[in-house]
Amino acid sequence: MFVGKSVVITGGGSGIGAALARGFAANGAYVCVGDLNEDAAHRIATDVNGVAVACDVRCETDVQNLIETAQKKFGDVDIFISNAGLAKPEPAHAASAANDVWQLNWEVHVMSHVYAARALLPTMIKRGNGHLVNVASAAGLLNQIGDAAYSATKHAAVSFAESLAISHNDDGIDISVVCPQYVATPLIEMSDDTVVSGSLLSADDAAQQILNGIAAKDFMILPHPQVADYCKIRGADHASWLSGMKGLRRKFLRESETGELKDMHNFV
């Protein structure tokens, strides 16, 4: 499916990124793994016979170095997956997160995608092909209760992906945006081998859905297909959707054993 393709993945040291690295390698791709945790990147790169690069996606020169390393090792980048992400739930009300938390969300969830596109688009446009995959979240289509900074920046990530598609599909460049709900990864304080149930997906299951979507050149990739139904409800009657979300928040606050967002998957 991806034989001979050069693939770069940020946040590739764990979670969905690591599962994607394994999936691409199993399908014949050459994989460059970027991660803030250099040891984790090397561990996954060793597993997939790829190359590892320490990369802080908040830093444009780090993203450029990641791309240049992949180009030197494997040639032109065919597929770039902006997967790095974070979650820092707000301490109190919806505007209570500190400015530096908002800025961190912006840099990781939006500007890292901009940096990758800025570095890759000129050569992709010139050769008339390439695929940019921006991992956002269902929160970028709906909302993440208890984390306004995450929700706002994931909405921005979806919008930027739309701008890329509108502007550059005609240049032969494929654009995908990935909007999962809850996946058992370190982002929600779960290990990659967590036993999953209900709406919680394993990283491997999410990665397979993403690989299928990339192969099909889908713009919107929904590892949790029910998200499409929620979006229809939101679009058809926003007031009713807001009412439902407020009800979900009340239920979570009333019934959650910990009150922590890592338990939210039990309520959706």
Q: Where are these predicted regions, by residue range?
A:
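Conserved mid-core segment of classical short-chain dehydrogenase/reductases
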Residues: 87-103, 146-149
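The beta1-alpha1 cofactor-binding region of Rossmann-like NAD(H)/NADP(H)-dependent oxidoreductases
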Residues: 38-39, 55-65, 99
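Catalytic Tyr-X3-Lys loop
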Residues: 86, 98-114, 129, 157
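Active-site helix of classical SDR
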Residues: 117, 153
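Residue(s) in the substrate-gating loop at a strand-loop-helix junction
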Residues: 137
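Active-site-adjacent segment of SDR/Rossmann-fold oxidoreductases
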Residues: 27, 142, 163-173
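Canonical Rossmann dinucleotide-binding motif of NAD(H)/NADP(H)-dependent dehydrogenases/reductases
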Residues: 2-32
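C-terminal tail/cap regions
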Residues: 199-200, 204-268
